[in-house]
Structure formats: C-alpha cells, structure tokens
Amino acid sequence: MNVILLIPARYGSSRFPGKPLAPINGKPMIQHVYERASLAKGLTNIYVATDDERIKATVEGFGGKVVMTSPDAASGTDRINEAIKLLGLKDDDLVINVQGDQPLIDPTAIEQLINLFERQPGEFEMATLGYEIVNKADIDDPMQVKMVFDNNYYALYFSRSRIPFGRDTQDYPVFKHLGIYAYTSKFVQTFAALPLGRLEDLEKLEQLRALEHGHKIKIAISASNSLEVDRPEDIHKCEQRLAAG
C-alpha cells in the first residue's frame, strides 16, 4: 500500500490572505508543515496541492514537491481529489490530508492514522483525529471544531458549537477535531462526487458531507494538539510554542 501525504494550500484565505507563505520564525508556514509532516514514518511521497504560483515557487524553493490544481476546488478534499487524478494514484493507495495551516503538526499523529488502516484493513474508508480539550476557552470558540463519537470510535457529529452540551454539569471531556484525514484514494473520489450536504453548508465543515451521506469516519485520539493558524494573531502563538520546544 502506497501512502501519499497531500497538503492542500490556497493563497486566497478570506480571514488571512497569503496564509501559507506567512513567516513563522523566518520560515514560510507551508515549509514548517511540509518538513514536520515528512518526519512521519511510513510515507511513500509528499506533495503540496495548490493553485497558486507563489506557493509553488516557495515549495520548490525549499526542495518540496508540488502538484498544481484548479482554482475552482470547492474544498480541501476536492483539491485532494484533483491531485489524486493528476498523480495517477491507485484506488487502494492511502491518502493523508494535512491542512496547510498546521505548522506544528505532530508526525506521530500522521503515523496513528496510517496504523489505523494497517490494523483494520477494509473496515472503514476514512479516518481522522481528535484531542481532548485542555484549555476550556477553546470549547466555545467556533474556530475550534468539536466532535462526538460512539463507543467504537466512529464519528457521530462535528460542530463549531459545544458538543455535547451538559444540561446539569460542565465537568466532562470535550474533544477537538484535528484537521488531518486519512482515506483510500477510491473514497476521496466517492466523496468528491457527493452533493454538498445541508449540515456541511451550515457549519462549513466538509467532513459532515461524509456523515450526511451515510459514510463512517473512524476516530483516533491524539496525545498532541495541532495548533491551526486561522488568523494572523495565531502566528505569535505558533512562535511561542516553537520557542517552548
């Protein structure tokens, strides 16, 4: 089984234009993501999937590989689907999708997802990660996506709101969704062909498309929290984390 890690990256973020090229400790964010992801064991290859020549030039400048995709991709997974076709991946190849705004991605988190597919082949087509929230302020932050799952670690729902809601207590674990996915190449093509889901459109969370159409998403719990850069002020948080080791 080939394991291909793809990093979708676009320049035109509405909240943070040019985000993948934003410097963090003197190095563009996309380079942090690429270099940390490449430390994961078990990868066959790694590419940045982008529609922007500036991102392409930056990635190739530090020795990374790029696949150029259309600017019309509706979501990161749709961009991944286009990259799969351009790269000629086989149906049973495993695709890891790491967002281009995760400069602190833990390589062992990527390995967790690879191990899930190796231990339970054929039992599911898509998997992702969660992390038990420690900073309680994150629970009510709509930029921090929350998740609930069943006793067999299959996703029930993802939301920008607090889930579950404790009617009589606030003393219970809440899990953050870490924006990293693993799926078979074949399933990515299936996913991309599905119509936009109602819940997906409301929450602006593409993973809900899979749940709305009856597909299972396997969950693994990570020991590390991957800080996403959603706003310019998140850059300073990343630099603080890097300085702390």
From Swiss-Prot:
A GO biological-process term: lipopolysaccharide biosynthetic process
Record pathway: Bacterial outer membrane biogenesis; lipopolysaccharide biosynthesis
Subcellular location: Cytoplasm
InterPro entries in UniProt: Cytidylyl_trans, KdsB, Nucleotide-diphossugar_trans
Major location (coarse): cytoplasm
Record's signal peptide: none
Keyword Metal-binding among record annotations: no
Keyword field contains DNA damage: no
Reactions catalysed: 8-amino-3,8-dideoxy-alpha-D-manno-octulosonate + CTP = CMP-8-amino-3,8-dideoxy-alpha-D-manno-oct-2-ulosonate + diphosphate
Assigned protein family: Belongs to the KdsB family.
Protein name as it appears in the record: 8-amino-3,8-dideoxy-manno-octulosonate cytidylyltransferase
Organism: Shewanella sp. (strain W3-18-1)
